[in-house]
Amino acid sequence: MNEQELKQMIEGILTEMSGGKTTDTVAAAPTKSVVETVVTEGSIPDITEVDIKKQLLVPEPADREGYLKMKQMTPARLGLWRAGPRYKTETILRFRADHAVAQDSVFSYVSEDLVKEMNFIPVNTKCQDKDEYLTRPDLGREFDNEMVEVIRANTTKNAKLQIVVGDGLSSAAIEANIKDILPSIKQGLKMYNLDFDNIIFVKHCRVPSMDQIGEITGADVVCLLVGERPGLVTAESMSAYIAYKPTIGMPEARRTVISNIHSGGTPPVEAGAYIAELIHNMLEKKCSGIDLK
């Protein structure tokens, strides 16, 4: 499938998901880089709402337009300034705020209401809490006998595809993207007469947990949608790890990975269409990872 065909497939999925309605895209009006701070009853505006791509703190730059054009190409913290040897207060506060968001995403859990709403099958790895999950990665790859039976009893044996959702290192990534990407994958698979059901949700999930799920279910392809380690740019980045007939202890080279799935990277709807195509190719060629190249 070439780039034009992939684009047409994505447009078709979007049209079908919206009930055939099309929406005109209106360009957002540019906002000023200088935000006036208004204190009301002892509170100030949320500093994280400032678009750092449009914020230039360098006083009297030689080429303001060129600087701002460069900042549009990257979310990196360019165009900062200093007071003596240190960063300005606004820069320090924004750094700490973004770091706090990343920490919150790691230590929080995916909402139980979301798991119920999506009709996921909830299971847990051998980790008992977040501390054990972070310090014992090996336990995040395995299920105890009770969880093995839950997986076996609630999934279709030897299915062509098993979809798995895992919290990973970012619960925010799952909550931000999962409602958009799953319908996109399902719509994309319809083009190849493929479908899936009985989605597993793994709490305290590490990527290799998909290998044991593959052995339990006997699925031809296992696709794991998992929250990735958050950074200072975003805490909502999700990845898809896909493997053909995964087995415990298999080399990482057998996995195909699509990363950086979020609103500021690869949009979840677009990623879903590409994932559907990859799953079809794996089933056709009976391989994944570097063998699929």
UniProtKB/Swiss-Prot annotation:
Catalytic reaction list: ethanolamine = acetaldehyde + NH4(+)
Record Gene3D superfamilies: Ethanolamine ammonia-lyase light chain (EutC), Ethanolamine ammonia-lyase light chain (EutC), N-terminal domain
Tree of life domain: Bacteria
Required cofactor(s): adenosylcob(III)alamin
Gene Ontology process terms (BP): amino acid metabolic process; ethanolamine catabolic process
InterPro entries: EutC, EutC_C, EutC_N
Keywords: Bacterial microcompartment, Cobalamin, Cobalt, Lyase
GO cellular component: ethanolamine ammonia-lyase complex; ethanolamine degradation polyhedral organelle
GO molecular function, one term: cobalamin binding
EC number: 4.3.1.7
UniProt-annotated binding residues for adenosylcob(III)alamin: 207, 228
UniProt pathway annotation: Amine and polyamine degradation; ethanolamine degradation
Subcellular location: Bacterial microcompartment
Major localization class: other
Cofactor: binding details: Binds between the large and small subunits.
PANTHER family: ETHANOLAMINE AMMONIA-LYASE LIGHT CHAIN, ETHANOLAMINE AMMONIA-LYASE SMALL SUBUNIT
Functional description taken from the UniProt entry: Catalyzes the deamination of various vicinal amino-alcohols to oxo compounds. Allows this organism to utilize ethanolamine as the sole source of nitrogen and carbon in the presence of external vitamin B12.
Family classification: Belongs to the EutC family.
Oligomer and partners: The basic unit is a heterodimer which dimerizes to form tetramers. The heterotetramers trimerize; 6 large subunits form a core ring with 6 small subunits projecting outwards.
Identification of the protein by name: Ethanolamine ammonia-lyase small subunit
Gene name tied to this protein: eutC
